């Protein structure tokens, strides 16, 4: 079943704040550099790659020497403004070391919900990919708000990555997190916790296993990753949740190794005939 992943041509890689940042709030440059190397090499191999990256607020907090995320919207958005600029500078530097060009794409929920602007986003991503450029997608935290009549926030980049995967008809979404996969119990409290190798259906029992919030600098948790998996499976797409501590694990996934948890409908798990 994992063997079919070798044929994946178009990939969406999602990396969370917990992977990009140390627990002390500093930027994990080692991981970011490895990620740039891996994705650049996948491009050299002929794969099409889109990176959905969190971290604007976390990097902004580091840049501004803040001990924690601000709680009010204007301060959060100001920090995101600083952080997104710094984050893209870091990415551009490391990807540039491997001769890989990247392009920034900032989205809000209303843009991908509205048909005309959604088509524009799809065309932009297709144009970038056709030129061998790796789009780096993030939510536009500087302007995104959540109001009663005008919702522009995705809520988290887990869902955003699934939406992007659907927009570009990706063959595989790889979600890099701070956990090895989806477990039957909490691995931080249960040393004997068993990890699912594959999930073919999101049942109420599976939903009940999802925990709470993520890191202190991020917004996601296991529940949001499960929501992203549900979104992917509804689109007949595959998603793998795995640990992003060492991004070279992506190479293992692309070789069909049994790492992380694969979310795929039963028939999709064995098939791979998507074309672009």
Swiss-Prot record:
GO molecular function, one term: ATP binding
Top-level class of the enzyme under EC nomenclature: transferase
SUPFAM superfamilies: Carbamate kinase-like
InterPro entries per the UniProt record, alphabetical: AceGlu_kinase-like_sf, Asp/Glu/Uridylate_kinase, G5K_ProB, Glu/AcGlu_kinase, Glu_5kinase, Glu_5kinase/COase_Synthase, Glutamate_5-kinase_CS
Keyword Oxidoreductase annotated: no
Keyword Cytoplasm annotated: yes
The entry's keywords: Amino-acid biosynthesis, ATP-binding, Cytoplasm, Kinase, Nucleotide-binding, Proline biosynthesis, Transferase
Enzyme Commission (EC) number: 2.7.2.11
Main location: cytoplasm
Pfam family, one: AA_kinase
Gene Ontology terms describing biological process: L-proline biosynthetic process
Residues annotated as binding substrate: 54, 141, 157
UniProt pathway: Amino-acid biosynthesis; L-proline biosynthesis; L-glutamate 5-semialdehyde from L-glutamate: step 1/2
Compartment(s) where it occurs, according to its Swiss-Prot or TrEMBL record: Cytoplasm
Catalytic reactions of this protein: L-glutamate + ATP = L-glutamyl 5-phosphate + ADP
Record-listed ATP binding positions: 14, 177-178, 219-225
GO cellular component: cytosol
Stored PANTHER family: GLUTAMATE 5-KINASE, ISOPENTENYL PHOSPHATE KINASE
Family membership noted in the UniProt record: Belongs to the glutamate 5-kinase family.
Record function comment: Catalyzes the transfer of a phosphate group to glutamate to form L-glutamate 5-phosphate.
Protein name: Glutamate 5-kinase
The organism of origin for this protein: Listeria welshimeri serovar 6b (strain ATCC 35897 / DSM 20650 / CCUG 15529 / CIP 8149 / NCTC 11857 / SLCC 5334 / V8)
Taxonomy of the source species: Bacteria, Bacillati, Bacillota, Bacilli, Bacillales
């Amino acid at each position: 079943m994992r063997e079919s992943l070798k044929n994946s041509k178009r990939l969406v890689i999602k990396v969370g704040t917990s992977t990009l940042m140390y627990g002390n709030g500093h930027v994990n440059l080692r991981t970011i550099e490895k990620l740039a190397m891996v994705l650049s090499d996948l491009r050299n191999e002929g794969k099409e790659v889109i990176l959905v990256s969190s971290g604007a607020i976390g990097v902004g907090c580091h840049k501004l020497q803040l001990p924690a995320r601000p709680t009010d919207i204007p301060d959060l958005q100001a920090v995101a403004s600083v952080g997104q600029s710094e984050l893209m500078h870091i990415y551009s530097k490391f990807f540039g070391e491997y001769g890989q060009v990247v392009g920034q794409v900032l989205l809000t929920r209303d843009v991908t919900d509205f048909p005309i602007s959604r088509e524009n986003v799809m065309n932009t991503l297709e144009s970038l990919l056709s030129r061998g450029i790796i789009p780096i997608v993030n939510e536009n935290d500087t302007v995104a708000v959540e109001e009663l009549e005008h919702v522009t926030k995705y809520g988290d980049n887990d869902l955003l990555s699934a939406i992007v995967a659907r927009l570009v008809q990706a063959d595989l979404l790889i979600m890099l997190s701070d956990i090895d996969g989806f477990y039957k119990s909490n691995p931080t409290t249960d040393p004997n916790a068993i990890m699912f190798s594959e999930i073919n259906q999101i049942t109420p029992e599976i939903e009940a296993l999802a925990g709470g919030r993520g890191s202190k600098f991020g917004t996601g948790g296991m529940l949001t990753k499960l929501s992203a998996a549900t979104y992917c499976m509804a689109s007949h797409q595959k998603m793998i949740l795995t640990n992003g501590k060492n991004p070279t694990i992506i190479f293992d996934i692309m070789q069909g190794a049994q790492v992380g948890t694969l979310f795929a409908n039963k028939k999709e798990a064995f098939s791979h005939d998507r074309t672009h």
